[in-house]
Curated annotation (Swiss-Prot):
Principal location: membrane
Keywords from the UniProt entry: Cell outer membrane, Membrane, Receptor, Signal, TonB box, Transmembrane, Transmembrane beta strand, Transport
TBDR plug domain mapped to chain residues: 131-243
UniProt family annotation: Belongs to the TonB-dependent receptor family.
Membrane topology designation: Multi-pass membrane protein
Organism of origin: Formosa agariphila (strain DSM 15362 / KCTC 12365 / LMG 23005 / KMM 3901 / M-2Alg 35-1)
Motif (TonB C-terminal box): 1021-1038
Intervals of motif TonB box: 120-127
InterPro entries listed in its UniProt record: CarboxyPept-like_regulatory, Plug_dom, Plug_dom_sf, TonB-dep_OMP_SusC/RagA, TonB-dep_OMP_SusC/RagA_CS, TonB-dep_rcpt-like, TonB-dep_rcpt_b-brl, TonB_rcpt_b-brl_sf
One Gene Ontology CC term in the entry: cell outer membrane
Induction behaviour: By ulvan and rhamnose.
Signal peptide start-end: 1-39
Compartmental location: Cell outer membrane
Protein name: TonB-dependent receptor P39
Amino acid sequence: MFKQKLKMKPKIKRNCTFSGLAFILMLLFSSFTVNNLNAQSEVTGTIMGEDGIPIPGVNVIQKGTKNGTVTDFDGRYSVTLVPGQLVLVYSYIGYETQEVPIKSRKVIDLTLKAELQSLDEVVVIGYGEQKRADVIGAVGSVDSEELSSVSPVDALQGIQGRVAGVQVTTNGGPGGDSEIIIRGISTFGAGSSPLYVVDGQQVNDITNINPADIESMDILKDGASAAIYGSKSANGVVLITTKQGKPGFPKMTVDYISSVSFLNNLVPVSNTRQWNKFESLRTGSTDASGQVEDSLGIRSQLVVDVQDAIKQLGVKNQVNLAFSGGGEKSKFYWNTGYLDETGIVKGSGYNRITSNLKIDFDLNKFITAGTRMTGTYQMQDGINEGSVFRNLSYRQPNVLLVDFDGSYIRERYARNNPLARAELQVNDNRQFSSTIFNYISVKLAPGLTFKTTLGFNYRNQKLNQFNPQETVNIDNGKINGRERVNTFYDFQNENFFNYNKTFNDKHTVTGLAGFSIQRWWYEYSDLNAIEFNNDYIQTFNNVKEYNLNTTGTDATTHALSSLYARIGYDYKSKYLITASIRRDGSSRFGENRIWGNFPAIQLGWKISEENFMKSLGFINLLKLRASYAITGNERIGDFESIALYNPGFFYNSVNGFAPVQLGNGDLGWEETAQQNYGIDLSLFKRRLNVSVDRYVKTTDDLLYNVPIPQETGFSNIRANIGSVENRGWEVSIAAKPIRNERFTWTTSFNFSYNENEVLELADEDGFETGGYLIEEGESLGNMYGYKNLGVFQYDESNAFTPDGIRLTPNFDANQNFVNYTLNGQAYNGDIERLKFANKVLRGGDIIFQDQNGDFNIDAANDRTIIGNGLSDFAGGFSNRFDYNGFFFSFLFNYNFGNDIYRDYDHIRDKASNAVYAPSPDRIDGAWVNPGDITKYPSLEVSRANNRSGYESNYVSSADFISLRNIQLGYSFNPDTLNKLGFINRLSLNASINNVFMFTNYEGYNPELGNRGNALEPGWDSLRYPNQTEIVIGLNVEF
């Protein structure tokens, strides 16, 4: 037994040795693994955006686990690892999700890249927000970066050329309003501008908004998206979201912009030679040399181009100082801006001071509240465009503006002095506006919130006009002026419930229900002075005589009450449906039609979510959209539906009242039925995004002043008279073809086509307004006049067959008439002569097209459509390139298919006096001698037929392609700035606005719009000219 034990020891020893070695190795491995895991148990870092600003709320998840955290207010995070994959996933709405291997790192700092168009990006809609992927309406968006690239003074300038179906025109000089048209003109006289909603508050004017305060602008173009705003949404809705504070350490941002601008185009005006030629030819002379007997005299040599005299270098300086920040319970944003702009025309300028404070509170986990307060003071030094620009176009070139002693040449007859008017006339607009908007939101239950808002708007405007003696006729002109004070104020209260709940991860139900009350007040006082005692004192205590017909005061008011609701259903983020209804009651309409109903429905299908599409990995989104809605327009004056009486009517020396307006109890809403069909496509990991929309907008019960028989004692009555339709297509393409660590290329293109048609009018024959004809079956904007076919070369050239075919006269070597031929064959038949006002036309007269074939040209029968002021095609194209902090961008916009009537040319070319100087083309291109082949007729003053009516010779194409903006800049690397310790962001940029324009238009600018008159687009009486602006900018954040 002892031996056995001895034999067993080596075996046991061997086994123990092997087991012990294994055990030791296991302990060593375990120790290494534990130590390794402990070494990697915590990873910290900071997450920033591409602009170097920390991003709070970024999800940081360990891949394959539920372990993770979110970044704090300063973008910092700390995550403790658990066994699993050593990879961190970083995700945040609007940014690309990134996966980063941990390896052996303890600190991982990361810069998130913004997605070109995130499907999870939030889009603002009426009374709420929605993921872009779930939007089933036609919504265009512009962010703050795009807005700031053109250094706009007016918020609307920043969206010019960037959104399909949206046309923006800048009117007037410094401080002038911009005009915006969405999907064509759908009204006659009820206002064509959209509704503006700022942070949920409806406003009538956005000139008091500093573009630097805007975070984004969302344009609701289709009826169903806008219908929740009911009676004000027929022309679309522009939703403006202003900037707000972000959690984190308080930041201070300084923006500074400085620019110079100059006139980039001149209107052709006649020189002294041409004026002398005109004076000779207008009397019937055939001397076209332009020479005069006193050819060495001062006036014969003098050439005065008023445009050179009134233009100047424009200068603009703009600075914004903003503070923002916040904590867990509150956040704030406060920006104060100052703008000082001197126009490119003497006497014009603009100053603006704005302040915007926005505070948001989380009172507890159920209640949030906030307030926004703004104040704006604007000072616009304007000029009377008609008395300056139109006058300069026809002023004699050999008449001085300033005498040799330095005084202004006084005005006499029709020889106005545009320089004196630009520099001395007072045409000032001063206004102060203020806004207060408050909200409280309460979470009543999971998915259910109640929100109430209360907003106030106030605006006080003072208009001051004064015409000193240097600007009135020296013989009988009187120093005159005007002072008008307008006061606008309104309040609105909104109360609504919002519901959003998802059931079983399949069914998402959203709901909205609420009511609102709005009321507006308007007051004015107007003082009009026919004559001042002198121009030393320009206040109204120096008035010698008032105009009692226009001096007075008045006040109006109107109210709007509304109920609204919306419900939406989403199945598996695949099938989408939304329906809404709004019921509005307006005090502006007749007693029989106070209330209007505005329903809408939207349908959407994400085909890309279907199983049969999953294999097509390059398609991120394929969505079909369809919608139908009825929207309204109530933008008419107050009290237009009721009979009005005014005092001041005397009978037997007794003051009494008399009717001044007929009532119309059936006056009601304009209603626009809108259909929209669209498709959205996102490809290649959202690098390419395409949207296509087809729309049809039909407006019924158009509001207009209808002429009535004079026997009633009134000239017209406001009524609902007909319908108009807009049909069109829109295409938007956005892409990011190249994107890597160092270089990014972003490009976009948009295109729109619109066709307009008047479907019905109360009078089937239509009606005229200005130089336009409105008639059934035709488009709005049709210019109405005579068709000019050329100029008769000879007296004998006025010869036609009874069928209206023009004959060819033949002459011998001595210019003696021989005979007529028709198609090369001698003609011996009957001959008709074209007449104007029963007077036979001669050589040098205009060949007007005879519309009815009676060989007598008259206004009733021979005018026709000679042009149209509405464009067919419009859009824009942009590119941006980013490389290692440098960025370069440019923006084109274009417009095709519309015309302009050159009214300024019409006035100076057709004037019968010897004071207005015609255009250079009119003088040098005039018929003088028999046989002349010319564009323009004889200048002989006795030929009144050549000066009659609007005609096609003054219609020009308004087509253009404009390089609207180019910008070059550099943003300093955040790592470099961090070493300084006190600068978070620093960027420099230089840009040029209105670089150049490809157009054949002869005037200052082919972008005319309609200047508030929807029925008369494209009428050019010379407005404030376009300008090229060179800008430098600095942005720094501390």
